[in-house]
Amino acid sequence: MGIFNGIIEFLSNINFEVIAQLTMIAMIGIAGPMIIFLLAVRRGNL
């Protein structure tokens, strides 16, 4: 049972809100260059 308590304690200490916010910022940050790349590849025709 000791290892399970350790895992539960580890998961309860993780701040999932910060992880979600950083994930969203990364997705938004990647979306900009992706749009520019698509515009360049398709010669401006989205």
UniProtKB/Swiss-Prot annotation:
Places the protein is found: Cellular thylakoid membrane
Cytoplasmic domain ranges by topology: 39-46
Family of this protein: Belongs to the Psb30/Ycf12 family.
Pfam families documented for this protein: PSII_Ycf12
Primary location recorded for the protein, binned into one broad class: membrane
Assigned GO CC terms: photosystem II; plasma membrane-derived thylakoid membrane
Topology of this chain in the membrane: Single-pass membrane protein
Complexes and interactors: PSII is composed of 1 copy each of membrane proteins PsbA, PsbB, PsbC, PsbD, PsbE, PsbF, PsbH, PsbI, PsbJ, PsbK, PsbL, PsbM, PsbT, PsbX, PsbY, PsbZ, Psb30/Ycf12, peripheral proteins PsbO, CyanoQ (PsbQ), PsbU, PsbV and a large number of cofactors. It forms dimeric complexes. Part of a photosystem II (PSII) assembly intermediate complex PSII-I; crystallized from a strain deleted of psbJ, it forms monomeric PSII before addition of the oxygen evolving complex. PSII-I includes 3 assembly factors not found in mature PSII (Psb27, Psb28 and Psb34).
Residues carrying N-formylmethionine: 1
HAMAP family per record: PSII_Psb30_Ycf12
Alphabetic keyword roster: Formylation, Membrane, Photosynthesis, Photosystem II, Thylakoid, Transmembrane, Transmembrane helix
Known role: A core subunit of photosystem II (PSII). PSII is a light-driven water plastoquinone oxidoreductase, using light energy to abstract electrons from H(2)O, generating a proton gradient subsequently used for ATP formation. Helps stabilize PSII.
Effect of loss of the gene: No visible growth effect at 10 umol or 60 umol photons/m(2)/s, loss of the PsbY subunit from PSII, no change in O(2) evolution under medium light, increased susceptibility to photodamage, cytochrome b559 (PsbE and PsbF) is in a low potential state in isolated thylakoids.
Residues in the Lumenal compartment per record: 1-20
Record-annotated membrane-spanning stretches: 21-38
Protein's name in the database: Photosystem II reaction center protein Psb30
Cofactor note: PSII binds multiple chlorophylls, carotenoids and specific lipids.
GO term, biological process aspect, one: photosynthesis
